[in-house]
């Protein structure tokens, strides 16, 4: 039997003592003193930061939002049942982060970047913070590349450029989401990554959007962030910032991205809800004083950044490429009141707005764009040349027609010029109607607008304008493939292409039925 040597035992103990590392982890902790509606009051967190993640019992997290003299006000991220007064809360020393990268494309996630589509975990490349400072003046480049939506009336009258913020505003049930989803569908094959942020919507509505994106093959380049109506106000408040951080991943690496916020009215409501529960002083319409900053700091992050910024950010890996993040925020108005607090705020922050009107929608004019109130403040410089040449008079025709049509209801005898303007306006209105989920190529849009501007529609019955357009495009795409390919490639109407297109339209009119 082997005997233990006492000197060996003492040597082993000495070695263990010498190798012992005393690591002390200091973490500030406090206790919950009150809990109501997902808002915590915590006592004892002395060195907590504003916006810091707080560790709650049961693997949950909170977000510090009010730092007061004797307590901290925080919101619970997610479900708050099971928490009670006296529970211990610990500081984490981290601000909130979400996963970013190409692994998120094709997935549906919540405001924290956690998958909710049942397709397993997301293998994210890296994480980034939710709240970031927007690029400075020197890092930006002017908007001069078109972001085609595939919707004739938008591309012709209120063009959108890459890096622009274009507001979509209107009452409920006027087709706001339809316009945004069509814009996403039109990015197929254009190397633009899309992010759709659903805030405060029914889960069934979001599921319907995801189904349509999958059906049309758009989900492969799209990430959906869902903060449904059933989720806490904190998640609805944070979802747009999470989506913006995911979009900035592409912008900062010299790629192009499109983000849709559907809709920011619900985010403002969620923020008002949180602020009132945190006992912050209410202002106009009971919103807190910083509700303008809530949206401005989000929308200013959508920008076109120059090649120097991209090169510096990627440490020289990407050279000579600009990046862009285009934002389409949606605002829901009440009874067409665009002068309410949140709509006026967002109108002043964005680079233009597409105003959708209930009366036009109910009259069957869809998309229901009001040509007079809709504007694009920077998109004109980015508009495709062919659309700019052909669509210039469309907006004026429509605005004059709407004005004259209202006047003509009371006048019995109209002069010839007025009657012609009204007849032309009727045909242009009919031409700009477009079915949902059917975005058009530049060549198709150009051919349709050419038919209107060249007077080819003047002798077509109003009821036959849409069948005429459909038959004309089918004819051109089958019999004049080279012409349409030339327009699609050059995105301009040269004299040669114009002659060919004019001849093709005349040939179609002389021998086709529609």
UniProtKB/Swiss-Prot annotation:
Q: Does the keyword Nucleotide-binding apply?
A: yes
Q: Give an example GO molecular function.
A: proton-transporting ATP synthase activity, rotational mechanism
Q: What SUPFAM superfamilies does the entry give?
A: C-terminal domain of alpha and beta subunits of F1 ATP synthase, N-terminal domain of alpha and beta subunits of F1 ATP synthase, P-loop containing nucleoside triphosphate hydrolases
Q: In the UniProt record, does the keyword ATP-binding occur?
A: yes
List the keywords (alphabetical): ATP synthesis, ATP-binding, Cell inner membrane, Cell membrane, CF(1), Hydrogen ion transport, Ion transport, Membrane, Nucleotide-binding, Translocase, Transport
Q: What reaction does this catalyse?
A: ATP + H2O + 4 H(+)(in) = ADP + phosphate + 5 H(+)(out)
State where ATP binds. 170-177
The protein's site described by Required for activity is found at 374
Chief location of this protein within or outside the cell: membrane
Instruction: Return the EC number.
Output: 7.1.2.2
Membrane topology according to the record: Peripheral membrane protein
Please give the GO cellular component terms listed in this UniProt entry: plasma membrane; proton-transporting ATP synthase complex
Places the protein is found: Cell inner membrane
Tell me one Pfam family matched here.
ATP-synt_ab_C
Per the similarity annotation, which family is this? Belongs to the ATPase alpha/beta chains family.
Role, per record? Produces ATP from ADP in the presence of a proton gradient across the membrane. The alpha chain is a regulatory subunit.
Per UniProt, subunit arrangement is: F-type ATPases have 2 components, CF(1) - the catalytic core - and CF(0) - the membrane proton channel. CF(1) has five subunits: alpha(3), beta(3), gamma(1), delta(1), epsilon(1). CF(0) has three main subunits: a(1), b(2) and c(9-12). The alpha and beta chains form an alternating ring which encloses part of the gamma chain. CF(1) is attached to CF(0) by a central stalk formed by the gamma and epsilon chains, while a peripheral stalk is formed by the delta and b chains.
Question: Which NCBIfam families does its entry note?
Answer: atpA, PRK13343.1
* Name of the protein in its database record: ATP synthase subunit alpha
Source organism: Acidithiobacillus ferridurans
């Amino acid at each position: 039997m082997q005997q233990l040597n006492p000197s060996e035992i003492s040597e082993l103990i000495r070695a263990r003592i010498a190798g012992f590392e005393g690591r002390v982890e200091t973490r500030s902790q406090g206790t919950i003193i009150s809990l109501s509606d997902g808002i915590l009051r915590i006592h004892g967190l002395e060195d907590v930061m504003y916006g810091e993640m707080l560790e709650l019992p049961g693997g949950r997290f909170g977000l510090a939002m009010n730092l007061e003299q004797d307590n901290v006000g925080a919101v619970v991220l997610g479900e708050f049942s099971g928490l009670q007064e006296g529970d211990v809360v610990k500081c984490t020393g981290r601000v909130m982060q979400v996963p970013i990268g190409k692994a998120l494309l094709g997935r549906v996630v919540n405001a924290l970047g956690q998958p909710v589509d049942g397709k397993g975990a997301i293998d994210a490349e890296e994480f980034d913070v939710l709240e970031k400072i927007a690029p400075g003046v020197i890092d930006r480049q002017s908007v001069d590349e078109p972001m085609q939506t595939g919707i004739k009336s938008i591309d012709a009258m209120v063009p959108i450029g890459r890096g622009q913020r274009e507001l979509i505003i209107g009452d409920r049930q006027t087709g706001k989401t339809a316009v945004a989803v069509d814009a996403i569908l039109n990015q197929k094959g254009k190397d633009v990554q899309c992010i759709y942020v659903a805030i405060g919507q029914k889960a069934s509505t979001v599921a319907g959007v995801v189904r349509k994106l999958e059906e049309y093959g758009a989900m492969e380049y799209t990430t959906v962030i869902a903060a449904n109506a059933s989720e806490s106000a904190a998640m609805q408040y944070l979802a747009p910032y999470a989506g913006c951080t995911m979009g900035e991943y592409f912008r900062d690496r010299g790629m192009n991205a499109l983000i849709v916020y559907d809709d920011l009215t619900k985010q403002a409501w969620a923020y008002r809800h949180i602020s009132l529960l945190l006992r912050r002083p209410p202002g106009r319409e009971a919103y807190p004083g910083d509700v303008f900053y809530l949206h401005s700091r989000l929308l200013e992050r959508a920008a076109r950044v120059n090649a120097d910024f991209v090169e510096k950010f990627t440490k020289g890996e990407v050279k000579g490429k600009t990046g862009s993040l285009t934002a389409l925020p949606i605002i829901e108005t009440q009874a067409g009141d665009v002068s309410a607090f949140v709509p006026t705020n967002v109108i002043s922050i964005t680079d233009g707005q597409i105003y959708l009107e209930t009366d036009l929608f109910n009259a069957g004019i869809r998309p229901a764009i009001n040509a007079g109130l809709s504007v694009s403040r920077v998109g004109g410089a980015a508009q495709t040349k062919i659309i700019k040449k052909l669509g210039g008079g469309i907006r004026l025709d429509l605005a004059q027609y709407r004005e004259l049509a209202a006047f003509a209801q009371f006048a019995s005898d109209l002069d010839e010029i007025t009657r012609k303007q009204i007849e032309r306006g009727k045909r242009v209105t009919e031409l700009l109607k477009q079915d949902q989920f059917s975005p058009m190529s530049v060549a198709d849009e150009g051919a349709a607008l050419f038919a209107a501007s060249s007077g080819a529609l003047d002798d077509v019955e109003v009821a036959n304008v849409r069948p005429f357009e459909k038959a004309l495009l089918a004819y051109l795409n089958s019999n004049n493939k080279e012409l349409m390919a030339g327009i699609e490639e050059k995105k301009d109407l040269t004299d040669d292409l114009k002659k060919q297109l004019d001849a093709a339209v005349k040939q179609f009119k002389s021998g086709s039925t529609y």
